[in-house]
UniProtKB/Swiss-Prot annotation:
GO terms for biological process: maturation of SSU-rRNA. Keywords: Cytoplasm, Ribosome biogenesis. SUPFAM superfamilies: Ribosome-binding factor A, RbfA. This is Ribosome-binding factor A. It comes from Anaeromyxobacter sp. (strain K).
Length: 138
């Protein structure tokens, strides 16, 4: 039996189960932002889980929610391990994933540039063989 993919499989199950637990909500009043688990990595020995989260809200909401997640790490570790029936409970470490916030910011900047006439109306190149102004002539 090959076990070289086991950490990746366990990480994906860990991410899925943690997402479900967070969707049900935690009782910590600091967790007010919308939390998305964007990814997870498991150490080869399955003793440490790094979970990447994106938190929607202003800076204060993100900081408070992240602090609440870190405080709830022990509870979340136990719940996920119980659901996955892992022999050892992996140590849970949260990392704030800024990629979603960066993507939202880029989208907003592109939208603003389009409305001010500073960017092309379409980010997509025309299909091969299509005239660039097919729609404009109709």
């Amino acid at each position: 039996m090959t076990t070289h993919n086991r950490p990746a499989r366990v990480a994906e199950e860990f991410r899925h189960e943690l997402s479900a637990i967070l969707a049900r909500g935690l009782k910590d009043p600091r967790i007010t932002g919308f939390v998305t688990v964007t990814g997870s990595k498991m150490s080869p020995d399955l003793k440490e889980a790094t979970v990447y989260v994106s938190i929607h809200g202003d800076e204060r909401v993100r900081k408070d929610t992240f602090a609440g997640l870190q405080a709830a790490a022990g509870f979340l570790q136990r719940e996920v391990s119980r659901a996955l029936r892992l022999r050892n409970t992996p140590h849970l470490r949260f990392v704030y994933d800024e990629s979603v916030a960066r993507g939202d910011r880029i989208e907003r900047l592109l939208r603003e540039a389009r409305t001010q006439g500073q960017a092309p109306a379409a980010d997509v190149e025309p299909a091969p063989g299509a005239a660039p102004d097919d729609e404009a002539e109709e």
